[in-house]
Amino acid sequence: MDVLRSIQKEATLEPLLNNIYNRLEKITNSKLLDDKNKVITSFLNIKEYLKKASAENSDFWEASARSFAYSLIKTFSASLLLDHAQWSLENNNDDFFLTISKRFCNQELSPLIYPNKEYIDDSLSIFNF
């Protein structure tokens, strides 16, 4: 919920998404392209989720806030790791950060949930406990 409040209050989502996109555009090293594509897929999943979720009520957002926050931070973190891995390969000819970014990108980067009514009701009962 804190991520959602911050995004709503400070209007930070669009700049963050632009940052991720611009960072990914700069990844050109062939060793990083498969992972770049994974992050792009995650990025597009988040954009699609936002389109669908924009028509939903606050209960939907509250029930899915954690998965949204995790998806956002994992995707952002992956873009940072790829960026640093590319820098390290170009400037130090070092593949240490390549290994780290590959391992990180090997997980589910956008574990978004689309809660149904039952899930929302269960979440509300837990929240109001």
Regions found by a protein language model. Name each.
Residues 1-129:
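Flavin-dependent oxidoreductase catalytic core characteristic
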